[in-house]
Amino acid sequence: MLPFNSCVYVLLIISLMSNCRALCRATALQGRSLCATGGPDAAFRAEHERLSAFESRPSSGSYDMRRALEPIEIETWFHIVSGETDADLVTDEMVILQLHYLQKAYEKASISYRLKGVTRHINETWARNGDDSAMKKALRRGGYSTLNVYFQTNLQPPSTTDFARWTSDGDNRHAYNSDLAPLSVLGFCTLPDPSINSSSPRSSYSKDGCNVLAKTMPGGPMTHYNRGGTAIHEIGHWNGLLHTFEGESCSEDNAGDYIADTPQQSVPTDGCPSQKDSCPDSPGLDDIHNFMDYSSDDCYASFTSNQLKRMRDMWFSMRKGK
């Protein structure tokens, strides 16, 4: 675990942020030629519908007020998984910057992340996601309410032909073609599972957590995707959010992400356009600055008010005390 002295931590963050350009080794991203999202199951959609109805009703008193104001602190573990040739890719400074960005991104939701520890492992198979189940069985810490993030230096799907099958298990993933590999993924993460309760065996949630390409951490070599935004996006899924373009349709019967204040959006955003309107007959422009779109890191800026509320409600409903 990194020793975080608060004063040193703040000074180091200021220094590192000012020198971030010097830390970044440029690697061109050629664009996401393949974006695949495993859809949420019926039980998870039903929970979103229930919470939508819950959030739209008038407040019923002190319980609702306490739930709305109670700070949420999530125990968190970072696991750095590297291959032999890139064992030094992820520095302590990159870990600190990623944690800082994580805290800032979620502070308006009164959600904070208490880093319990950082583990480091050199394993060629795990680094490329060759055996996700074995890796998580060996490395995962804590209960269902504990966030585990696996930063892998060469995160890939098992094979191009298996990608559709690989994305059909309810995880949310986004992918790209790059000069680093024929097909790589920026990250994927599990959504909360309504069937998990406080007495569920550890084996029932052994794969819970977020897998993130380590090159997307602040100071990493992935140009346009090296400010740490991928981890923010994936942890949004862990907190229960769907993509802003969920359903990829402008149809009135498409519930989208079940969030009332995210405009209807039919396609993911690539890069950072000045503006975009994929559903011109629906109110509002695409929220290209939303962490739950597929925009580049320089475009990411915020969650909506209702997304912040939904993440809190998902925590109390799906993860707290489990």
From Swiss-Prot:
Its main location: secreted. The keyword Protease applies. GO terms for biological process: proteolysis. Glycans are attached at residues 123, 197. The keyword Ribonucleoprotein does not apply. It comes from the Eukaryota. It is found in: Secreted. Pfam families: Peptidase_M43. GO terms for molecular function: metal ion binding; metallopeptidase activity. Its EC number is 3.4.24.-. Residues 1-22 form the signal peptide. The active site is at residue 234. One of its GO terms (cellular component) is extracellular region. Keywords: Disulfide bond, Glycoprotein, Hydrolase, Metal-binding, Metalloprotease, Protease, Secreted, Signal, Virulence, Zinc. Disulfide bonds join 272-299. Zn(2+) binds at residues 233, 237. Belongs to the peptidase M43B family. Secreted metalloproteinase that allows assimilation of proteinaceous substrates. Plays a pivotal role as a pathogenicity determinant during infections and contributes to the ability of the pathogen to persist within the mammalian host. This is Extracellular metalloprotease AFUA_1G07730. It comes from Aspergillus fumigatus (strain ATCC MYA-4609 / CBS 101355 / FGSC A1100 / Af293). The lineage of its organism: Eukaryota, Fungi, Dikarya, Ascomycota, Pezizomycotina.
